[in-house]
Amino acid sequence: MNGPVPTNLAPTTGGGSWLSVIALALAAFIFNTTEFVPVALLSDIGRSFDMSTAQVGLMLTIYAWVVALASLPMMLLTRNIERRRLLLFVFLVFVVSHLLSWLSQSFAMLLLSRIGIALAHAVFWSITASLAVRVAPPGQQAKALGLLATGTTLAMVLGIPLGRVVGEALGWRVTFLSIAGVALATMLCLMKSLPLLPSQNSGSLRSLPILFKRPALVITYVLVTLVITAQFTAYSYIEPFALQVAQISGERITLLLLLFGGAGVFGSVLFSRYSDRFPHGLLVGSIGLLAACLLLLLPLAGNFYLFAGLSMFWGVAILSFSLSLQSKTLKLASDATDVAMALFSGIYNIGIGGGALLGSIVSSQLGVASVGWAGGSVAVVGLLLAMASTRRFREALSH
């Protein structure tokens, strides 16, 4: 998940285009959906290849770590390429890779296709938020960023549950084929609506030493690593946890995913309303709520209604956290936004991959019932760091 960038980029000449902004928001929806939709399909994919969910879950780790390793190098390699051409090429790779996922007859082939998608993802999130600002109608940059954030949020609300519904009805391969179809339509829309977009404010390797000399920014990146690792230790295995531990039916698991994602919308509203008044309090509160939800995952698994309520608080917590950290990153690195966001995306995906790997190890060694305890313990470490860093953040953001 990635978010807005500052609006200090030059807009395009002309009047801007809401069609382009909407297409970019749809693209954000598609890219976030495909990253996490395997979470809802682990059991089905495992049955296809006669593998355990812990083994299939490593696909999430590989995807995330490819994004993490590729984000900054790909951003630097492509920093001088005209953005419309680059974005269309990214979509071409994305669509072809999803067609390979649809055709996969082995887990190795599926992994190869996911690596192609991950490379497209790495470039996409390094450039897209700044493009939304540039193509927005004059004076409408904030609304454009809001639409992009909405697309990101809707991936959790609708994309992942819809992917599960399609997978349950028609098979997991059709889920990937459907994503390819929607991506192709979005690509054609962008091809028609986007103007030429020369690269701007992309930054360079010279930005890195400067950024890493900012203690508050370094703490932000460490918090991202810890808390996202905690989140995906449990979330990566929520489907097998719900099936095997909570004894919840497939239809109710889809409902849980909808509740989790829908509650994230409320987290976005909380962030919009209170982030300026209580920037650090919102961050600490969201980490504390996340830690509590993860630690209560197993104790509340026996009651569907309590478990559903927990899922909603969990959704609020993780989206509030993600938006808070993105906002801090962009304020602390407004002079090198593309580099800072490429680092953020890479580190976020280190957390996703690390969490999926830790969840796989815990599931294999202790059982899937223990993923909440493991994730919650890591979240508590993040909470302590956030509480200890209050003064550092206030000093850095007051300048």
Curated annotation (Swiss-Prot):
Disulphide-bridged cysteine pairs: none
GO MF, any single term: carbohydrate transmembrane transporter activity
Gene Ontology cellular component terms for the protein in this record: plasma membrane
Ranges that cross the membrane: 21-41, 56-76, 87-107, 115-135, 142-162, 176-196, 215-235, 252-272, 281-301, 304-324, 339-359, 366-386
Keywords, in A-Z order: Cell inner membrane, Cell membrane, Membrane, Sugar transport, Transmembrane, Transmembrane helix, Transport
Keyword Coiled coil: no
Family matches, as InterPro entries: MFS, MFS_dom, MFS_Efflux_Transporters, MFS_trans_sf, Sugar_effux_transptr_put
Location in the cell: Cell inner membrane
Topology of the protein relative to the lipid bilayer: Multi-pass membrane protein
Entry annotated with the keyword Membrane: yes
Family per record: Belongs to the major facilitator superfamily. SotB (TC 2.A.1.2) family.
NCBIfam families assigned to the protein according to its UniProt record, in alphabetical order: PRK03545.1
Function comment: Involved in the efflux of sugars. The physiological role may be the reduction of the intracellular concentration of toxic sugars or sugar metabolites.
UniProt-recorded name of the protein: Probable sugar efflux transporter
